Curated annotation (Swiss-Prot):
Substrate binds at R69, G70, G71, K72, F73, T74, F75, H76, A143, I144, G145, G156, V157, A158. Pfam families: LplA-B_cat (PF21948). It is found in: Cytoplasm. It catalyses: octanoyl-[ACP] + L-lysyl-[protein] = N(6)-octanoyl-L-lysyl-[protein] + holo-[ACP] + H(+). GO terms for cellular component: cytoplasm. The record marks K140 as: Lowers pKa of active site Cys. This is Octanoyltransferase.
Length: 209
């Protein structure tokens, strides 16, 4: 059984990044067990390896961190559950297949949202998890950006629970101009973070056996 570790309070992004990277090194060199960090960050904009500077619009006094994960700009802050799985894809019960790993992440989050009555989708050529908000119009509810070192995964998924969605106006989220973002709260689903965490742990064990 993989251990889920909840980081208390609001976590500084750079401190958490170092925590992840240090543990990845331990998994690689010392064969430490797989773990998953559950985090709620202080406000921060992060840029993945495919970012374009013009996609950073008006960040005000919110810090901007340039990371090594895949993807473009996104926002992290209170009310958002960020999940950092540190999994060894080279282990006998996993697969050395990054596309399969991302597909499993998507299925995991879609199933977790479905528990709360939210029908979520993946959309071709648009990374992340989406929900239909109006006829033929979708909004992103979860962002995905991962990195792998020697087949050990880090970074992960950010799901908007009760996030201040106005903060996304400081960027072009994930490089998708005019795209909408949403949250469980905005969809009328009010859930405590601890309750959400229980469901994602249950659903994880169904997908990542």
């Amino acid at each position: 059984m993989i251990r889920f570790i909840t980081i208390p309070d609001f976590a500084d992004y750079q401190v958490t990044l170092k925590l992840m990277e240090d543990y990845v090194n331990k998994v690689i060199s010392d064969h430490e067990p797989e773990i998953i960090y559950l985090v709620e960050h202080l406000e921060v904009y992060t840029a993945g390896t495919n970012y374009k500077q013009e996609e950073l619009l008006n960040y005000g006094d919110i810090p901007v961190i340039y990371t090594g994960r895949g993807g473009k700009f996104t926002f992290h802050g209170p009310g958002q559950r960020v999940i950092y799985p540190i999994l060894n894809l080279a282990s006998p019960n996993r697969h050395k297949d990054l596309k399969l790993y991302i597909k499993m992440l998507e299925e995991w989050i879609i199933n977790s949202l479905n528990y709360f009555g939210i029908k979520a989708y993946i959309i071709k050529d648009k990374v992340g998890i989406w929900v239909k908000v109006r006829k033929d119009e979708f909004a992103k509810i979860a962002a995905i950006g991962v990195r792998v070192r020697k087949w050990v995964t880090y970074h992960g998924v950010a799901i908007n629970i009760s996030t201040d969605l106005s903060k996304f106006s400081g960027i072009i989220p994930c490089g998708l101009e005019n795209s909408l973002v949403t949250s469980l709260n905005q969809l009328g689903i009010h859930v405590e973070m601890s309750e959400f965490d229980k469901i994602i742990q249950t659903e994880f064990n169904k997908i990542f056996k």
